[in-house]
Amino acid sequence: MKSNVCSIHMKILCLTAFVSFFAIQIACQAMAKNVEVQAEYLQHRMFDDRFINNYNLHLFQKAHEHAGLTLHRGLTVTRAHGYTTEKGVHRDSNAVGLGPAAMIRWERPLSEKLYGDLELSGSFLIYNKAFPAQGRPWGFMWRVGPRLTWKYTKNNSFSLGYMLSHSSNGMKNKNPGHHAVGFSLGFNHNF
């Protein structure tokens, strides 16, 4: 049993090292032409036995743009707080996660300075402990939702979005995923 646990932790460590190396290589090759910061508070929804809220911070950089679609790469930091109940047992589910992120955005102008966006993003997160309770110390966060962006100068914009999030480790066993929804505030600056 102990060797299984060590093997799992070694696989997670190797995967984390690979993903980190890949992210660092991309960051070193990219010229930072813009930065976008998104902060959000998402409240639990849809599952009766999972009461987990997320405080998320996403840092994105535009990597590619074509015909109204933009691809972004970045980093996600999350602070999840709450609990799960399974078969009447209350388990705290508090954790901090960090990992690489990618986002696809479809943007259309509504007026000269106002744009309507649809976003889809995914993050691979390593948590400081098994999360949610009885889960694993790693997982994925998927987000989708509309966003309004106000470009108040040539180089700066504010945005407000409404996001639906699904967090899960993607495994068939030990996969206590959860959903959350809420508002996301963003700021973008072009250099």
Task: State what each model feature region is.
Residues 1-33:
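Cleavable N-terminal export/targeting peptides
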Residues 26-77, 184-191:
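Short glycine/proline- and aromatic-enriched beta-strand/turn motifs that initiate or cap beta-hairpins
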Residues 55-63, 75-77, 100-108, 120-124, ...:
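Residues on the lipid-exposed face of transmembrane beta-strands in outer-membrane beta-barrel proteins
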Residues 33, 49-55, 92-100, 136-142, ...:
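Residues that define the transmembrane beta-barrel architecture of outer-membrane proteins
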Residues 31-35, 65-73, 94, 112-118, ...:
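Outer-envelope beta-barrel architecture signal
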Residues 34, 147-191:
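Predominantly the C-terminal beta-signal and adjacent terminal strand-loop region
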Residues 44-52, 110, 131-137, 171-177:
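Solvent-exposed loop/turn segments connecting transmembrane beta-strands
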Residues 76-94, 129-134, 172-175:
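Flexible, solvent-exposed loop segments that connect beta-strands
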